[in-house]
């Protein structure tokens, strides 16, 4: 899997030198290098209930996410590299022997585009503690490479963790506030904003923009 990501990255760099924006990518992804932007086709999921993910992949965490992207997280990872994103590391919730650790990596501005109507991802999710939209940020954490049955795998591809809210430690993109995924340690606080989200099954485009360092 690491080799696949590297090949996609190198192909993207080569394409960027010879082609103008947008650059077609795997599974409908489009890259706009001039805008440090990656556009990914997605399907709307929940408009009610509780969330642990913001964005997953089909047939993974669709019961706890507002969108499913129609591409592998490793493909999005490679595309973010092409537009200048720098992966860091997923966060970790607090434990008995260590404090919480927020995710690290390039700051990302994520929006949903539905036929020209654009909303920030933070505004599509409600923090139940305040009743308002999310106040934190999303960062390019980069998930993890793990060995399984003798093969190296990209963990977010297996788990479907494209954009996390609670902290599983496998997220491609993490939310800036580390929070335990266990309800025994932290109550559920994230829920969909049904006033802004489209009906389940609606086709949308998610836009990932790498922010300049001085915005971090």
Go through the PLM ranges and name each one:
Residues 1-8:
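Sec-dependent signal peptide recognition
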Residues 19-216:
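Long, low-hydrophobicity ectodomains and other hydrophilic envelope-associated domains
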């Amino acid at each position: 899997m690491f080799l696949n990501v590297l090949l996609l990255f190198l192909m993207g760099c080569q394409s960027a030198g010879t082609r103008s924006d947008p650059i077609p990518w795997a599974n409908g992804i489009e890259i706009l290098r001039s805008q440090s932007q990656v556009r990914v086709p997605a399907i709307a999921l929940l408009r009610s209930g509780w969330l642990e993910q913001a964005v997953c992949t089909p047939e993974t965490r669709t019961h706890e996410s507002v969108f499913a992207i129609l591409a592998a997280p490793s493909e999005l990872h490679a595309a973010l590299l092409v537009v200048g994103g720098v992966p860091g590391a997923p966060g970790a919730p607090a434990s008995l022997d260590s404090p919480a650790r927020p995710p690290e990596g390039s700051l990302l501005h994520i929006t949903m585009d539905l036929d020209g109507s654009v909303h920030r991802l933070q505004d599509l999710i409600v923090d139940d503690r305040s009743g308002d939209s999310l106040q934190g940020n999303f960062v390019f954490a980069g998930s993890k490479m793990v060995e399984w049955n003798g093969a190296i795998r990209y963990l977010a591809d297996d788990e479907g963790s494209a954009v996390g809210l609670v902290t599983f430690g496998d997220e491609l993109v993490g939310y800036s506030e580390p929070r335990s995924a266990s309800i025994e340690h932290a109550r559920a606080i994230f829920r969909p904003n049904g006033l802004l989200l489209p009906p389940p099954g609606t086709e949308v485009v998610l836009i990932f923009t790498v922010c300049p360092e001085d915005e971090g």
